[in-house]
Amino acid sequence: MEHSVPKNKLKKLSEDSLTKQPEEVFDVLEKLGEGSYGSVFKAIHKESGQVVAIKQVPVESDLQEIIKEISIMQQCDSPYVVKYYGSYFKNTDLWIVMEYCGAGSVSDIIRLRNKTLTEDEIATVLKSTLKGLEYLHFMRKIHRDIKAGNILLNTEGHAKLADFGVAGQLTDTMAKRNTVIGTPFWMAPEVIQEIGYNCVADIWSLGITSIEMAEGKPPYADIHPMRAIFMIPTNPPPTFRKPEHWSDDFTDFVKKCLVKNPEQRATATQLLQHPFIVGAKPVSILRDLITEAMDMKAKRQQEQQRELEEDDENSEEEVEVDSHTMVKSGSESAGTMRATGTMSDGAQTMIEHGSTMLESNLGTMVINSDDEEEEEDLGSMRRNPTSQQIQRPSFMDYFDKQDSNKAQEGFNHNQQDPCLISKTAFPDNWKVPQDGDFDFLKNLDFEELQMRLTALDPMMEREIEELRQRYTAKRQPILDAMDAKKRRQQNF
């Protein structure tokens, strides 16, 4: 439910408001979840009574990215893009005050209801999203992280683009960008290949988001993201798992988004004229879906509150029994829901299951620094960078960092390199499932299944390490040859 009706609509924070402490201007009500670079809270603007969202970002976070997000939001004025009202510094945090979208993200709604969206609902969401993209692209901006998690709905059903933490600006002197930034499963092929890209990279991501809204997850979500990054540029464009369940118009819309050649990919303006979007129903059809999701959210919050109260009571009892020798652990963060799920073969029903790879790998991937780009922006910039030095693809650094983080968290609890684990843990004669064919598993006994499950992570690490070694073996001779040529040129 929204808060009280605003006394007058907040357009921008006044100079007077910006000189005060944020607590004097806002009442913070509750934590909504985690966004790029910070936590997001629901708050009320005391003077107008309007509900807003406040992103609190630790100053030690990547300040350049935060400033970029603020800069892009400041320049935007569209009903299809989340509005920016102002910002504050408070202790070690930067407070960014933004428009509040009461229904949350489309991915939140899917998770809360345990259902995917219908075609009519998807068309309505896509129409607003395309209008937001048309506006951004007209302003020469690329969002670069379009996905269901970054499409927010207000309580009336209007969709708005959010989370500009990785958005980029195109200038007249720079037709294409060359940084790999975004979320792996939603990335356009040209972004992964680092061959330069423009606004239509967002259109590919929108096509993937269309499948995500229809099926509950993007294509390749069940495989390791590193493999996905190699498969997206080489495989044909992904399609629905069961195309016969969807109309010709919807299938054709997704097909036009997922054209591998960016020169042949449709623009946001062109897609707004597509029959699937032209025939979209008004936002009022989303109200039942939003009401159901918000009711589910309120119910879950009540259940969490009850559990916390019960835990507190139990803790107090245990403390008394143990004569104050027990240390009470902190409660879980009540942030954005992280449950993941897979879709059943039936219509729109999601079956929740335990933690999967999808849960830990759908976060935004910000890989290359734009430092060099920003410096070049100040002077003249070449249309197509032609540096003679061939650099290691930047997405490899991302996986190095992921592996490093896993090691720090005690991921290698066996205290040995998973790549060096004896092959007896996973014999070479084990059958590897192809294209999701897992029928042979039914014939295995429980112990063999358990053994396979235990060996899966080390097996994955070994395969990745072998892939890395093959890559290095191919790359090093090229670098050596280049160095030799450079030395000859210098001697010349």
Curated annotation (Swiss-Prot):
GO terms for molecular function: ATP binding; metal ion binding; protein kinase activity; protein serine kinase activity; protein serine/threonine kinase activity. The modification Phosphothreonine is found at T179. ATP binds at L32, G33, E34, G35, S36, Y37, G38, S39, V40, K55. Keywords: Apoptosis, ATP-binding, Coiled coil, Cytoplasm, Kinase, Magnesium, Metal-binding, Nucleotide-binding, Nucleus, Phosphoprotein, Serine/threonine-protein kinase, Transferase. The active site is at D145. Residues 26-277 form the Protein kinase domain. The keyword Metal-binding applies. Residues 286-328, 443-476 form a coiled coil. Gene3D superfamilies: 1.10.287.4270, p53-like tetramerisation domain, Transferase(Phosphotransferase) domain 1. It is found in: Cytoplasm; Nucleus. GO terms for biological process: apoptotic process; camera-type eye development; hippo signaling; intracellular signal transduction; negative regulation of canonical Wnt signaling pathway; positive regulation of apoptotic process; protein tetramerization; regulation of MAPK cascade. Residues 297-307 have a biased composition (Basic and acidic residues). GO terms for cellular component: cytoplasm; nucleus. It holds the Pfam family Pkinase. Residues 297-339 are annotated as: Disordered. Stress-activated, pro-apoptotic kinase which, following caspase-cleavage, enters the nucleus and induces chromatin condensation followed by internucleosomal DNA fragmentation. Key component of the Hippo signaling pathway which plays a pivotal role in organ size control and tumor suppression by restricting proliferation and promoting apoptosis. This is Serine/threonine-protein kinase 3. The gene is stk3.
